């Protein structure tokens, strides 16, 4: 037995990143693994996507520094609305000890510093997919 589940459901991922190149790279990783991505360039676009879907996403993959807010605030809004994703991953150029602690306090499961090691992200997405009910 390989240790892999027989089948996993694709994750519904809310991807929030204002940098076009980073957004495309992250989207490509998720799509290559077969996941559904809902892409926003800023916090308010992300909140609009969540409102239109009217259900929690499996995973939030968000930059911390956004033009109209930050990833910490976004996760707080989602949590307060009862729409917190099962997993939340912060991706940022902000990588001080204080930033990492703030991400943890906000409820992020991981905080990756840019540039992101895509193999590590792939492993976390695979692990998250195994945890989602069919």
Mark where each language-model region is.
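The feature encodes the CheY-like receiver
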Residues: 67, 96
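A Lys-centered signature of the CheY-like receiver
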Residues: 114
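Acidic, metal-coordinating helix/loop segments flanking the phosphotransfer/catalytic sites
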Residues: 39-59
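Acidic catalytic/metal-coordinating carboxylates
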Residues: 42, 70-73
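Short amphipathic alpha-helix used as the core "switch/output" element in two-component signaling
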Residues: 48, 72-85, 125
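Two-component/phosphorelay signaling modules centered on CheY-like receiver
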Residues: 20-39
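Active-site residues of response regulator receiver
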Residues: 63, 92
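Non-catalytic signal-transmission and effector/linker regions of two-component phosphorelay proteins
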Residues: 1-14, 20, 27, 117-134
């Amino acid at each position: 037995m390989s240790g892999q589940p027989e089948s996993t459901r694709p994750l519904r991922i809310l991807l929030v990143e204002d940098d076009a190149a980073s957004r495309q790279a992250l989207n490509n990783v998720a799509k290559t693994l077969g996941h559904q991505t809902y892409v926003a360039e800023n916090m308010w676009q992300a909140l609009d996507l969540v409102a239109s879907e009217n259900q929690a996403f499996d995973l939030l993959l968000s930059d911390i520094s956004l033009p109209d807010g930050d990833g910490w605030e976004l996760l707080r809004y989602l949590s307060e609305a009862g729409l917190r994703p099962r997993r939340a991953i912060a991706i940022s150029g902000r990588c001080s000890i204080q930033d990492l602690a703030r991400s943890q306090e906000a409820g992020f499961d991981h905080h990756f510093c840019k540039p992101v090691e895509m193999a590590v992200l792939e492993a976390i997405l695979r692990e998250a997919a195994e945890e989602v009910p069919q």
